[in-house]
Amino acid sequence: GPMGVGKSTVTHLLCSECAQSVMLDGDWCWFQGDKEWDFSDKTKQMALNNIAYLLNSFLQNKAFDTVFFCWVLHEASLEASLLNRLTKPFDFYHFSLICTPDVLKKRIFNRAGLTENQKEAQWKRAQERLSGCRELKTMLLDTSDLTAVDVCQMIKERIHAD
């Protein structure tokens, strides 16, 4: 899902509630502070390399049964590029968290620690990412009227149903 939809919050909850699990937030792999981020192809490739390295490490570690990963994956090519870099077989569930544009705007503009210019820039990018997420072949979860706890429960039910 797009930035501001609740991916990190939900993933933290999932990791806390599921035994022998670990989480990776893709933003950790190219965090650029509070300044305007560089979204060039060079930095995207660096982020994908870093993410793949960490995911492969987690998947190979027998201490973890479940790896929760969150990142803005709004293009099928990003997902394919990342999956092609993973070396160990695993069960894969891809959820896209979405919400209405009004709810997304409210969430972004209520975020602490961002300047108004940063919020405007995030809102612009988030709108583009939201439409891309809706087009992917994933399990879409509309979080507009849900709490993070509700979304966490829905994901756990879908994962454990298999």
Where are these regions (language model features)?
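P-loop (Walker A) phosphate-binding loop of NTP-binding proteins
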Residues: 2
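Glycine-rich phosphate-binding loop used to anchor ATP phosphates in small-molecule kinases
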Residues: 46-89
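Conserved phosphate-donor/acceptor-positioning beta-strand/loop module used by diverse small-molecule
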Residues: 71, 88-108
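ATP-binding Walker
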Residues: 5
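Small-molecule kinase domains that catalyze NTP-dependent phosphoryl transfer to phosphate-bearing small molecules
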Residues: 113-154, 162
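Short glycine-/polar-rich loops that comprise or flank the Walker A/P-loop
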Residues: 64, 88-93, 134-138
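Conserved nucleotide-binding/hydrolysis micro-motifs of P-loop NTPases
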Residues: 29-30, 74-75, 98-103, 146-147
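Conserved substrate/cofactor phosphate-moiety recognition/catalytic segment
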Residues: 8-53
